[in-house]
UniProtKB/Swiss-Prot annotation:
It catalyses: L-lysyl-[protein] + 3 S-adenosyl-L-methionine = N(6),N(6),N(6)-trimethyl-L-lysyl-[protein] + 3 S-adenosyl-L-homocysteine + 3 H(+). The gene is prmA. CDD domains: AdoMet_MTases (cd02440). InterPro entries: Ribosomal_L11_MeTrfase_PrmA, Ribosomal_PrmA_MeTrfase, SAM-dependent_MTases_sf. This is Ribosomal protein L11 methyltransferase. It comes from Burkholderia pseudomallei (strain K96243). Methylates ribosomal protein L11. NCBIfam families: prmA. GO terms for biological process: methylation. GO terms for cellular component: cytosol. It is an enzyme of class 2 (transferase). Its main location: cytoplasm.
């Protein structure tokens, strides 16, 4: 199937109405740009963060609609202009959109990722680069965690070095399930993944099935009672601080915990909250992010 871009320029007061009408009448997508971009008349649309912008569209707006090549653009634009209440149909130009194998193009942007000593995160359309690799088959999807983000990488490196055969592991904020799956592949016994997002829980279950990893997933209310040998939480600094008591209570005395989703400048603040329960410090830093790791004190 081939496509074309219908490009029309018009005053800002009509841009939103025309865009909405084009979508209602069958345009596949619509975007609005500054028609004066890269000229002396270019106008910034937004000001300082937190302030209400003075304008919600550019003085001279360019509306770009992606349409099926079988659609008559003149008829479509005339109908949209009438629907939007314009006095006349704007002038327009057509641009041919080069046909692409979009699946192949998307796949080409995701290559296998090497992490730690033996870990490879491999999309389903690739083969494992090394015969002795510890392979996690994972495709980009709706849930966070494909190994590309520094925090995920840090936690994976820590798990590879930490997990011992048969240990119990809790992945709190599991996202795609990548850390829970890795823990299982590293030899862990009972592994549990918890996430606040039901969609992430379903994605994690699917990924575990694909990787033949026996992991139990659920929402926070499903988190089992009791303690774990290892707890890992790759979330963000504020939730980590709020959940410090709960997460620390999930670690067995003498057990290990790793926390990430923490910027280097936030490390001391997060560590100080956990210091009541855990002997904790920065384990490793990567691209401005840190992984904090420690051991729960026997006396707590």
């Amino acid at each position: 199937m081939s496509y074309r871009e219908l490009v029309a320029e018009l005053p800002r007061e009509h841009a939103e109405a025309l865009s909405d009408a084009l979508v209602e009448l069958g345009a596949l997508s619509v975007s609005v740009e500054d028609a004066d971009a890269d000229t002396p008349d270019e106008q910034p649309l937004f000001g300082e963060p937190g302030l209400v912008p003075e304008r919600t569209a550019w003085q001279h707006s360019r509306v770009i609609a992606l349409v099926d090549a079988t659609q008559d653009p003149a008829v479509l634009l005339a109908a949209a202009a009438n629907e939007a209440g314009l006095a006349r149909t704007p002038r327009f130009e057509l641009r041919e959109v080069e046909e692409q194998d979009w699946v192949r193009l998307t796949q080409s942007q995701f290559e296998p990722i090497h992490i730690g000593e033996k870990i490879w995160v491999v999309p389903s359309w690739h083969d494992a680069p090394q015969p002795d690799a510890l392979v996690l088959e994972l495709d980009p999807g709706l849930a966070f965690g494909t190994g590309s983000h520094p925090t995920t990488r840090l936690c994976m490196e820590w798990l590879e070095q930490t997990v011992q055969p048969g240990q119990t592991v809790l992945d709190y904020g599991c996202g795609s399930g990548i850390l829970a799956i890795l823990a299982k592949k590293c030899g862990a016994g009972r592994v549990t993944g918890i996430d606040i997002d039901p969609q992430a829980v379903e994605a994690a279950r699917h990924n575990s099935e694909r990787n033949r990893a026996d992991v139990t997933y659920g929402l926070p209310d499903d988190c089992p009672d009791g303690e774990f040998d290892i707890v890992v939480a790759n979330i963000l600094s504020n939730p980590l601080k709020l959940m410090a008591s709960m997460l620390a209570s999930k670690v067995k005395p003498g057990g290990r915990i790793a926390l990430s989703g923490v910027l280097a400048r936030q490390a001391d603040e997060v560590a100080s909250v956990y210091a009541r329960y855990i002997d904790i410090a920065v384990w490793r830093e990567h691209e401005g992010w840190v992984c904090l790791a420690g051991t729960r004190r026997e006396s707590h």
